[in-house]
Amino acid sequence: MLNWRDPRNPLAGGAERVTLAYLRGLVERGHEVTWFANAFPGGAPEEKIDGIRVLREGGKFTAWLAARKWHSEQDPFDLVIDQHHGIPWYAPNWCPDKCVAYIHEVLGPIWDAFYPWPLNAIGRWQERLTLRQYSEVPFWTASDYTRELLTEQGVETIVQIPYGVATRALEELPEKELDEPLRLITVSR
């Protein structure tokens, strides 16, 4: 698994939680799993998380070079998962092993929300170009909408694996007095 962040990265979010759950499932089925991610201050260069070998090397702009070098020194892998989040690892260009692209969302207009011009325009352009370059690489996503956007960009093979939901119901919901008016806030990213 090539992902810019791993579960212990201070900037890790939902994508890393979902990825960890999928990879944990592979380990439980007897597979050997390695997760290559960016290094971060205070992060060990290597550790095991839930049976997954996590390697951290390189930074925001150099991790893909470190991954490429590290991969070239390894025996072949059965599968390399190139996780996209804005910018992929371009593994099909340097990895002779079978590659799958894993994507949670096509960023598209999200570039505008996080980056000023011209970075937003460059990001959108790069993403469209990248998806065309990856058109023959099998993609894996969970969302119908992402599948539709990938299809519009010319991606030929898309496997949709819905997100699993692990919930534990409250055994008891304590009574509590609520003041009127009731207000609710939801925060997400």
Where would I find each of the regions flagged by the language model?
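Carbohydrate-associated surface elements
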Residues: 145, 161-164
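Membrane-proximal helix-turn-helix segments that form the acceptor-binding/catalytic region
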Residues: 118-140, 148
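N-terminal strand-loop element at the rim of the active site
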Residues: 5-9, 25-61
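A short, glycine/small-residue-rich beta-strand->loop->alpha-helix junction that serves as a flexible
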Residues: 4-18
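Conserved donor-binding/catalytic core segment of Leloir-type glycosyltransferases
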Residues: 140, 176-189
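Short N-terminal targeting/anchoring amphipathic segment
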Residues: 56, 70-89, 100
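Acidic anion/phosphate-binding donor-loop and adjacent secondary structure
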Residues: 151-156, 164-181
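Active-site proximal beta-strand in glycosyltransferases
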Residues: 79-81, 94-112, 119-120, 140
